[in-house]
From Swiss-Prot:
A zinc finger (C4-type) spans 7-37. Belongs to the eukaryotic ribosomal protein eL24 family. Zn(2+) binds at residues 7, 10, 33, 37. One of its GO terms (cellular component) is ribosome. Binds to the 23S rRNA. Binds 1 zinc ion per subunit. This is Large ribosomal subunit protein eL24. The gene is rpl24e. Keywords: Metal-binding, Ribonucleoprotein, Ribosomal protein, RNA-binding, rRNA-binding, Zinc, Zinc-finger. It comes from Thermococcus gammatolerans (strain DSM 15229 / JCM 11827 / EJ3).
């Protein structure tokens, strides 16, 4: 079975054959699950500030642990 890809922006897993793969000039490969993630990445938006991304959810858990 093929390995699932992980979106470079939101952190969501998605099936191979879907989404987009972008290769930067330095050789780094970025996977995007949707055009929404792709556009937000190229616009320079920080995924830690958007509630629906995995990066935001992980940052929120870390903040909650620090408060205790």
């Amino acid at each position: 079975m093929a390995r699932w890809n992980v979106c470079s922006y939101c952190g969501r897993e998605f099936e191979p054959g879907t989404g987009k793969m972008f290769v930067r000039n330095d050789g780094r490969v970025l996977f995007f699950c949707s055009s929404k993630c792709e556009k937000l990445y190229f616009m320079g938006r920080n995924p830690r500030k958007l509630k629906w991304t995995k990066a935001f959810q992980e940052a929120r858990l870390q903040r909650a642990k620090r408060r205790k």
